[in-house]
Curated annotation (Swiss-Prot):
Protein name: Arginine repressor
Sections of the chain in a coiled coil: none
Species, as recorded: Histophilus somni (strain 129Pt)
GO molecular function terms listed in the Swiss-Prot or TrEMBL record: arginine binding; DNA binding; DNA-binding transcription factor activity
UniProt lineage: Bacteria, Pseudomonadati, Pseudomonadota, Gammaproteobacteria, Pasteurellales
Gene giving rise to this polypeptide: argR
PANTHER family, sorted: ARGININE REPRESSOR
Protein family (similarity comment): Belongs to the ArgR family.
Length: 155
């Protein structure tokens, strides 16, 4: 009976975090209590967040929320690139690529490897953002199209 309750609490906890809408531990506590887990408090939620490796990251609405690592789509060598790239935008001189957390350096290295022959002068990568500088005289729209074709392949 106790294990069943613990398992259902863990399942409810993981389900809540997968919604990516909880920005504080107190919000998670309230949601779990509304689901019938009245014995849950902030310290219990804090221990669960640590145990399952939850982190705070930005969701699609740019809000800081808790989520579990498997929701972060941590890249591996079998991940299709299109699953790691969230957005490609540009101005007249620079391309900005938004990726899943942890994927930017992997993708930037790939872009650097195709290099000048494809019109890429260089890249700068953080955790989830890449700045791509095109070579002089290159049509930025053509470069974006080439980059997007590259993302259709896998690593």
């Amino acid at each position: 009976m106790i294990n069943e309750k613990a398992d259902s609490l863990v399942n409810a906890f993981k389900e809540l975090l997968s919604q990516e809408s909880f920005g504080s531990q107190s919000e998670i506590v309230s949601a779990l209590q509304q689901m019938g887990f009245t014995h849950v408090n902030q310290s219990k939620v804090s221990r669960m967040l640590t145990k399952f490796g939850a982190v705070r990251t930005r969701n699609t609405r740019m809000e800081m929320v808790y989520c579990l690592p498997n929701e972060l789509s941590v890249p591996n060598t079998g991940s299709p690139l299109k699953n790691l790239v969230l957005d490609v935008d540009h101005n007249e001189t620079l391309i900005v690529i938004k990726t899943s957390p942890g994927a930017a350096q992997l993708i930037a290295r790939l872009l650097d490897s195709v290099g000048k022959s494809e019109g890429i002068l260089g890249t700068i990568a953080g955790d989830d953002t890449i700045f791509v500088t095109p070579t002089t005289g290159n049509d930025i729209q053509v470069l974006i199209t080439n980059i997007q074709k590259l993302f259709e392949s896998s690593l």
